[in-house]
């Protein structure tokens, strides 16, 4: 699948790009980043020639929270744990970067600066490993594919995507977008 990144659409270019690529057929859209405004996609639909189907990922996410409260509570606990990890990481990163700047001011360049930068990279790597570990533990304990509500939504999203000639992801809240894209297995 070809990817075309358009950026902000203050002056819409989507219709022009769709025409120039020869796009024909149904287009799946994701407006989950708009959150409660997800269904307000008439302008987007118009730009696509009304040949679109909104995957309604935000609505599906809300449905999972309502119909599978245990999963939703576990997901909130994960979000809180990841938030705490992020807060501690940012605190540590701030001091590590201050050390880099201090070494640069004192030593200019050379091995001391390289070592300070390496310490920042090690901190980044450790943070990514810890987040990966938290997520892996969550998905092992709460396997989304085994949750009936999620599995049903995943199947419907897969069906809609299988009939689509293209996928358009509108902007919005990046955290909500990544969460819903992952939960409903859009990349599969």
Predicted regions and their residues:
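Extended, subdomain-level signal for the structured scaffold at the beginning of enzyme domains
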Residues: 1-168, 173-176
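Glycine/threonine-rich flexible loop motifs
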Residues: 174-184
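Short alpha-beta junction capping motif
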Residues: 186-188
């Amino acid at each position: 699948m070809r990817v075309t990144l358009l950026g902000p659409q203050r002056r819409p270019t989507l219709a022009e790009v769709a025409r120039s690529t020869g796009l024909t057929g149904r287009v799946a859209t994701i407006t989950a980043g708009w959150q409660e405004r997800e269904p307000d996609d008439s302008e987007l639909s118009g730009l696509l020639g009304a040949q679109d189907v909104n995957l309604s990922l935000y609505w599906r996410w809300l449905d999972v929270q309502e119909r599978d409260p245990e999963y939703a509570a576990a997901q909130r606990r994960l979000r809180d744990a990841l938030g705490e990890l992020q807060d501690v990481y940012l605190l540590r990163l701030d001091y590590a970067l201050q050390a880099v700047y201090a070494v640069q001011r004192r030593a200019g360049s050379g091995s001391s600066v390289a070592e300070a930068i390496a310490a920042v990279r090690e901190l980044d790597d450790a943070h990514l490993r810890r987040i990966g570990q938290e997520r892996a533990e969550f998905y092992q304990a709460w396997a989304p594919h085994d949750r009936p509500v999620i599995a049903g939504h995943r199947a419907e999203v897969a069906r809609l995507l299988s009939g689509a000639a293209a996928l358009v992801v509108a902007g919005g809240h990046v955290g909500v977008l990544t969460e819903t894209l992952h939960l409903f297995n859009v990349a599969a």
